[in-house]
Amino acid sequence: MKTTRDGADDSAAAGNLRDGSAHAAYVRDAANGKAPAELEALVRVLEARGCELVRPNARRGLHPLVMPLAATTTRGEGGEDEEEVYGLMMTEESGGESVMPVVRVRGGVHAALVGKSASEFVHRAIVEEEARSDEERTTVAAAAGAVGVSLHNHGAFTTSGKEFDVYVTTHIGKFPSSMEGLVKRHLDRGDEQSALITCDLYKSTFGEWGAPHVFISDLYGKLGRDEEARDAARHALQTPWSTIGGSEAIERMIRVAGWQGKNVAEIKEVLESRRGPSAAAFDGPKSEKQLAREESELLLDQLAAGEIEAATVNQRLAECYMNAGKPTLAKFIMCGSMPTSA
């Protein structure tokens, strides 16, 4: 049997990773949350796709708000091997069951949304297997077990006659990669207007993430619409920088925005000044909670920009979340600073 990435053997510890119980317990203890019902299916699907399972507390060097599930190695843009970590991102308390999107993290801190929920990720993975397989291969579907059966009837994609991104968007949900695929589909057909309309839908669906704005900025640039490319780049820099797509994308957005040579704090000052003095007067003095929230955002953006390291920021980040009235996130951050144990 295969060992896990962080050295767990084929004992009960490894079994607890494969059935999701270790990660579910960590969500409960470290985040005061309830793990998604599909967590076991999600973990088994990731393993079926070739990932190695990762202990939930193996968080050193990882985005402070991500609990790792599994990891794999891929080839980076420069030809070098690069680790990808799949995990659940902790979000602000919503008063009910925790909302934990599935993310893929590269470079330790750059998070891409790959599923708004565990259920949607599993469903898409099953359909992707059906779309790519020339044979009746159902490795991923089998790994998903009863959850997979409840989500997808085998052969439904094939008999639908729809393209993959169209099927996913209409039968499962919206995913950044599929939204981008739909835009490219329109462009390949010479339908620029439909492509831009789809961009608007993409932005309205995932506007709090940086990647959609990067994609749209790049598209406007290719179309020679430089002013709109600049505006989209500036929108990207107003989102969490860890969601922009990586160091190269961050640098490109800063350049397209016209803010070369500025660091994170300076760019935030520019963005604040663009609101105008009347906005500040209307808002009134900032509360301690608001100031703490803004500092937490600054720290995470500086982390994504490579200006600071996670090991040096976690304690202050946890303090900011506590002062901002987000004790659950503060606790999760501090748990990430604890030594990894078997």
Question: Language-model segments: which ranges?
Answer:
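A surface-exposed partner-binding patch
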Residues: 1-93, 176-179, 203, 207-213, ...
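Long, contiguous interaction/recruitment modules in multidomain scaffold/adaptor proteins
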Residues: 40-174
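Alpha-solenoid helical-repeat scaffolds
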Residues: 169-176, 189, 207
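Amphipathic alpha-helical repeat scaffolds
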Residues: 180-188, 200, 214-218
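Alpha-helix C-terminal capping/termination sites
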Residues: 187-191, 222-226
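Inward-facing hydrophobic residues that define packing positions of alpha-helical scaffold repeats
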Residues: 199, 233-234
